[in-house]
Amino acid sequence: MTMVSSPPKSRPKRAKLKVEVEVPKSNLKYIAPMRGRFDHHRVSKMMLAVYGEEKFQAMKEAGVDKRMMFGINPHYQALAMGEELRTLDGEVLVPKMPASLPIAALIMPRLEETADMAGAKDPSNQMKYTASDDEFYGKLLHKYDEIVLGYASPTCSAHCRYCYRLDLFNKDTGKTGIRPEELRDYILGYNQKLEQNGGKDEHGHKRWPVREVLLSGGDPLVLPNFALYRYMEAAGQAKIDILRIGSKELAFRPERIDDAFIETLKLVHERYPHMHVNIVTHYTHPDEFLLRDENNNYIKNENGPGYKWMSPSYKAVKSLLDLDFLSLENQTPMISHVNDTVEAIHILHHELRRMGVKPKYIFQGRDIEGHKAFSVPVETGWRIHTNAMKGLSDTSRSRFAMSTEWGKMEIMGVIEGFKFPAHLASTVPAAAREAIEAILGEGIVVFRAHRAPHEADTQFGLVIARRNPEALWISGYEDRVLYDFRREADQRYSGLVEMLVKTALGSEDEDENVIQLARSAAA
C-alpha cells in the first residue's frame, strides 16, 4: 500500500515590514562577545588560565559546557578578572580594580553545576502559554492578557550561568525566535478577534486586549540597530501602548548604549509618539556599575550622595533617561555567591533609584536543571530581601517573588513557629494543643499571586504553607500547603482540613487508611 503524505501547510502571506528610514549603525567590534563550548580554542585557553588543567578537565568530564555554553565580552571580563579595558583611542572604559568575585560567580562555569541536574527543562512551564497556532508555537509567550513576550534574539553578549532560558539556547523545548511581522500580526489578529467576540474568548471568559509587547530572548540589544528597529516598528504597527525591552546589556556592555542606538530610539518615537518605551534592565550586583578602590570599597561621591559610577554605565543610564518617552526598571534573581547579601541588595536598590532606575523585582532563582548550584533557599532569600529594604523609601523598594506556572508569586512573609508557653499549655485541651502546634509549630509562609495568568479572577490569591527552610522553589511547599487559591473554591482549605483530621486521629505516620480518610474529609 502506498502512503501519500499530506502537503505541508503553507504560511499565510504577510505584509512585509518596510523600514522607511535610515537606521544608524553601532560599532561594537571592540567589545564583541566570545561564546563557545570548552573545545572552542579561545574558551579553552581562558578556562585553563583561570582554573588550571585539573579542574578544567574535571568540568569537561562533568559536561558543564554541555549544560550551558560559556559566553563573555571584554567589558564584563575586565570586571570579573580585575583587568583594565580601553577603547582603541585609549579611553578608559573599565579602570584597573580588584577582580569582582560576585561577577566572576555570575559568569564563570562552576563544577557543581552538574553535580545535581534536578530541575525543569522548561521552568514555570512556559510552553503552556505559547500560542496554540502552529505558526506562532514556541515563538511567543502570552501568559498575561495585556502583554505578549516575543523571543527576538537567541543569544546574549555574555551568559549568566543561572539563565532560565537554557532551553532556548539549547533548543530543548521548542522555543524559537519570532519575526517582526509575525509578532505584529499575532497581536493585531488577537485583538481583532477579541473585539469581534465582545471582549471574550472562545470559552466565554472575559479577556483584555494586548496593550504591551516585551521583546526578550536572549537579549534583544545584541541585535544590530536595524534588526531591533524592525521589532520596534512591528510594535508600533500593532498599535500597542508600551514597548518593553528586557536586557542585561547595560550591565554586560553599557557601551552598547551609544549615540547610534539613542538615535534609533528617537526614530521610533518620531513615527509612534504615543508608544512609551520601557527598558527592563538586569543589574544584579553593584560591582557591575560602581567604581571600587584598591581595597575593593566603593568610592563615595565627594560633592553629593551615593557612590561613583563607572563612566560607560553612567553615560548609558543618563542618555536613556534624557529621552522623555523612555523609562528604566530593574529586575534580577538572587543568586548564591553573587548577590545573596543584605549589603549587595541594599546598595543595588539605593544606587539604581538614585540614578532614576526603578527597582521592580528580586526573583527567586528558577528551578532550571542544575539550579541547586545557584539557588538560595526561599526563606533565606526572603529574609535577605526584607532586611535589605530597611532604610529605603517605598519608591526604592522591589518585590521578592518567584515567576511560577501560576503567575508571579510574591513571598509576603515568613512567620516563626508557635509553641504554647509552659504556663498556658495545661489550660488548653490536649487535642486542641496538638492540632494548633501541628499547623503552626514549624511556622508558615505566605505567598500572594501578584500577577495571575489570563483573566484576573485569581489576582492576589494566597497560598499559605507550613515552613520548609530548605525549599528552593514553590514545589518544596506543595505537601505542606494549608490554603491554596489555585484549587477550586471548595477545595482551597483541603490541606488544612487534611492535617486537622490526621491530628485528630492521632496519626503522624504515613498510614494509608488515615491519609485516605483525611483526604476524603478535606474533599
What are these regions (language model features)?
Residues 191-203, 208-210, 218-392:
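Conserved AdoMet/S-adenosylmethionine-binding subsite of the radical SAM
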Residues 144, 166-213, 230:
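Conserved alpha-helical substructure of the radical SAM core
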Residues 53-56, 81-101, 114-137, 189-209, ...:
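Intrinsically disordered, low-complexity coil segments
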Residues 2-142:
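Flexible, acidic/Gly-rich N-terminal and inter-domain linker regions that tether
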Residues 76, 160, 360:
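Conserved, mostly hydrophobic/aromatic
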Residues 136-139, 149-151, 185-186:
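Catalytic micro-motifs at enzyme active sites that drive phosphoryl/nucleotidyl and oxygen chemistry
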Residues 142-179, 245:
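Canonical Radical SAM [4Fe-4S] cluster-binding loop centered on the CxxxCxxC motif
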